[in-house]
């Protein structure tokens, strides 16, 4: 039974409402039905530079900014005179998700002002070399190239096939990137795994004593750049397709080598596979891992950095939310790609000839897993 705390419901948003299970479920359902608004507002805010603007101001003065002040400080000054009003509407949504802090002030008339919350630092465009940034991840996930694949989800369930291929003329993701320089650059800028690597290096000791470290599918080489900055004695080999290396900068102690991990892998006494295996089927993973195994000395290892899915889909578990969100991203973006459980990683290690695998430590949403020869 519900309890009415005031005589009637009205248009006054401060009027308490009937509290009961059905009402709570209804509110949750409405929130889910309109959930598309938040990620799209988040994406636009990142593209506009809102978080960088607010965070820079908070770092200097710890002060709040009005929407008009925010608009005037954006990297691109809006030509639209109504921009502050629109920014205010966007920011109050972000405030409801605790991404920014909102307060009301009276300066002639009452208005809302905003300040960055600590979580904003994970979304700063200019923070990739510091802790890594999720800004590019949001932007690429909601780029039209990936959005178009979601429209194929129902048909893939009913008829089979590959969501990405259905949306893009039968092409696979990594083949497509070779034809779209804009999207390839955007994809290769996704930088939060740098934060994962830096966090892991705070506790992971597995690179001590390594002489030659090969990053298989290393993209632009930023992972090896981080590792060799801590272990300058290591010779790093950043191994990837030619199109991926085209945008790779120079890092001290790192050599960029072009090739195909499905054909062979450069020799090293340790290797990294960072967020590579989740792109591929079990069969393809075994091919990659067997090539790594062949190029390792006895007692060599592959350092696998991957998300590990929980065995149960527990309600309210943030790790489960992240794991299964990302699993669905793999479902739509990579044919046969998926996130895996501990048991599935152990099975891959065994099928590829490794003696065992061990789950060493966790950094944010990823585990550091050693596949030992």
Swiss-Prot record:
Positions bound to S-adenosyl-L-homocysteine: 217, 240, 260-261, 274
Record key words, sorted: Methyltransferase, S-adenosyl-L-methionine, Transferase
Active-site positions on this chain: 278
Entry keyword Transferase: yes
Pathway: Secondary metabolite biosynthesis
Keyword Transferase: yes
Enzyme class: transferase
InterPro entries: COMT-like, O_MeTrfase_dom, Plant_O-MeTrfase_dimerisation, SAM-dependent_MTases_sf, WH-like_DNA-bd_sf, WH_DNA-bd_sf
E.C. no: 2.1.1.-
Coiled coil regions, renumbered to chain: none
Disulfide bridge map: none
GO BP: any one term: callus formation
Pfam families assigned to the protein according to its UniProt record, in alphabetical order: Dimerisation (PF08100), Methyltransf_2 (PF00891)
Similarity comment: family membership: Belongs to the class I-like SAM-binding methyltransferase superfamily. Cation-independent O-methyltransferase family.
Functional note: Involved in indole glucosinolate biosynthesis. Catalyzes methoxylation reactions of the glucosinolate indole ring. Converts the hydroxy intermediates 4-hydroxy-indol-3-yl-methylglucosinolate (4OH-I3M) and 1-hydroxy-indol-3-yl-methylglucosinolate (1OH-I3M) to 4-methoxy-indol-3-yl-methylglucosinolate (4MO-I3M) and 1-methoxy-indol-3-yl-methylglucosinolate(1MO-I3M), respectively.
Listed name of the protein: Indole glucosinolate O-methyltransferase 3
Gene: IGMT3
